[in-house]
Amino acid sequence: MKIDETTYYSVLGLPTTANKKDIHKSYLRLARKLHPDKSKSNDFEELFKVVVQAHSILTDISSKQEYDAILKRKGLSNYTPLGYKEHTKKQNQSNNLNQQDASKNSKKNDGVPTQSKVTRKNKPYEQQPYGFGLDFNEGSKMKKDKQKGRNTSKNSKEQQGSQETTNTSENLQRNAKGNKNNKNPRKDRFHTLDNSLDTENDNKRRNIKKAKDRTSKDQNTYSHTNYQRKRNKVKFTQGSIRMRNPEATQSNPDLQNDWDPLKDIISQFGNSNIQDDFGIENIKPSSDPRTFELEDLSLDCEYDFVESNSRVRRANMQNVFINEMDRLMINDPLDMSSIKHSLYSIPYTKRQKTSQSTYTFNDQNYRFTERLPRQENSEGPFGEIPSVFESSTGTMENHRSDFNLRGRPETRENDNIIIPEMMHFPDAVTSKEEEVSLKTRFNHFNEDCNRTKEYILKVLKNRISVDKDLSDMMTVPEYHSLILATKSFDVHLSKQLLELNELQFNAGQRYTELFKSIQY
């Protein structure tokens, strides 16, 4: 047995596009052939080790990705083994043959109904024949059973007349058979009894139907309606159904006794002398609710509030006209002291007081103070005024001094950032000593520039952290000028960083040109 060991995929007999399921299937197929328990040859044992290694690498996701990258570099990403190509060709040929056979069979069977083409007709169960609605199947030949046991409610009226004729014809046929074959008289006697019973039942049904028809004709007569009224007299007297010509109902004394207490309650509502629990008199309504006098529209204005037993009583109402309103209105100004006293008298729970916390960051060249947002205290019943509405006098000066420690963009006197000067380069390098000195000076220049760049980046990082901590404070209108100053300082720092990068680029370019022109 030979195995293509070009790639791990070809060891398993698969292309590089195989998925995990195909890898596992091919591994099991080869393991059944090459496992040491199945074959004792040493060659198969070595091949099985190669198959196990290929399976372990291709089933692991990380190792499979690394191996695929190696195959791409080697140009083997689209490699397919020879055995896989032959297998696919055979499979395609077999599929084509199966398709051709299926097409031939379909041509031969044209016009012959198959089971897949047959559909059942949608009918109710009672109307469904014994053949289950199939066109090519014949129904049962027991027409007698169909007529007796399969009669539907829709066709019952139409088939009643036909049943009578069929019963009589069946009786004649059975009697004729009985005369010919007298071997079993019990059987003949049994048939005659059954037929007589059927005819009797049919006659009874016909008589019942005729009686019903006779009553339906007499329903419109006066005697019939009078009978129905007397029959349902109890229902009409109870009031559930109204009659066309009802009789006069007699009064019931029990019902009158039930209405007496309700009449007393209604009569008490009309009495104007009754007062409620709050001392308010009830006004007697007028006879006609739609008519009223102009004097009744006057204002009830005299309000005398008296505190007694935690209730408010209103004095007797009097009619007050509009010209008397000035005399009765209250001219005293509103006193807020009573409202304040009532508010402070409300019980409340005090919260624990918290102090303002600060955090300082110290450095040799940089310092700032982070002021955390102030937590609210509750000295009074409603706490202190929120910090957003307080006047921030003095705090702006403190924060401005914190920003001044970093250096102001207007003047460069307070800046601690010192940009190194451009190093001097000779016109040409003529000796070994000049070359060594040029290298040392260039290294020192790069170290100074990098040190300054580190400091600038550190300042920018701290500036970002301060902006995050003081973002709420910067939205206050008093700090708008401070926002502009800090942002201009950020621009100044970025310009210095750009200047340093340009110096280093120019120095490096000049340094490489000198070393290219060395001639000694």
UniProtKB/Swiss-Prot annotation:
Biased composition (Basic and acidic residues): 397-409
Domain of life per record: Eukaryota
Coiled coil: none
Region listing for Disordered, in residue ranges: 82-257, 389-409
Location (main, coarse): cytoplasm
Keywords carried by this UniProt record: Chaperone, Cytoplasm, Nucleus
SMART domains, per the entry: DnaJ
Compositionally biased tracts (Polar residues): 152-182
Domain J: from-to ranges: 7-71
Protein name listed in UniProt: J protein JJJ2
